[in-house]
Swiss-Prot record:
Pfam families per record: SelR (PF01641)
Superkingdom: Bacteria
Any GO MF annotation of the entry: peptide-methionine (R)-S-oxide reductase activity
One GO CC term, this protein: cytoplasm
PROSITE patterns: MSRB
Reactions that this protein is recorded to catalyse: L-methionyl-[protein] + [thioredoxin]-disulfide + H2O = L-methionyl-(R)-S-oxide-[protein] + [thioredoxin]-dithiol
SUPFAM superfamilies linked to this entry: Mss4-like
Protein family membership: Belongs to the MsrB Met sulfoxide reductase family.
Protein name: Peptide methionine sulfoxide reductase MsrB
E.C. numbers: 1.8.4.12
The organism's taxonomic lineage, starting at the top: Bacteria, Bacillati, Bacillota, Bacilli, Lactobacillales
Protein species of origin: Lactococcus lactis subsp. lactis (strain IL1403)
Active site: C115 (nucleophile)
Residues in MsrB domain copies: 3-126
């Protein structure tokens, strides 16, 4: 999608996060403390990224997930910004900056913590999956 169209479609924060590799403030974002059942999709493309089943309270200040809905929906990239080395997470289809993945997650779930900016996500409640075109993901919740 063209940058000008994206600027009109997204909030200023969502644009800064997804297109300019920004980071929203910790603990003051939409999904850090949000635990309803449903699907988290890329705010740019609508691509399904994470389910509420894999979300947990990590205490980091951003939504944290143990894994994406499918390994192919995200891509990882080495990030050497801010005088440290991390692994950036981007959406596969829209190439949106989502956040970072760390190896300090729950050991019983594979020890990964996908630390994702709320501004990069849109939440689709479980009871609206079919209506919004995400019916194929209902099976994840049974």
């Amino acid at each position: 999608m063209e940058k000008e169209k994206l600027k009109k479609k997204l909030s200023l924060l969502a644009y800064r996060v997804t297109q300019e590799n920004g980071t929203e403030a910790p603990f003051a974002n939409e999904f850090d403390d949000f635990f309803e059942q449903g699907l988290y999709v890329d705010v740019v493309s609508g691509e399904a990224l994470f389910t509420s089943l894999d979300k947990y309270q990590s205490g980091c200040g951003w939504p944290a997930f143990t894994q994406p809905i499918d390994k192919g929906v995200v891509k990882e990239k080495r990030d050497k910004s801010l005088f440290m080395e991390r692994t950036e997470v981007r959406s596969s289809n829209a190439d949106s900056h989502l956040g970072h993945v760390f190896t300090d997650g729950p050991l019983d779930k594979g020890d990964l913590r996908y630390c994702i900016n709320s501004a990069a996500l849109r939440f689709v409640p479980f009871d609206q999956l079919e209506a919004e075109g995400y019916g194929e993901y209902v099976k994840y919740f049974s």
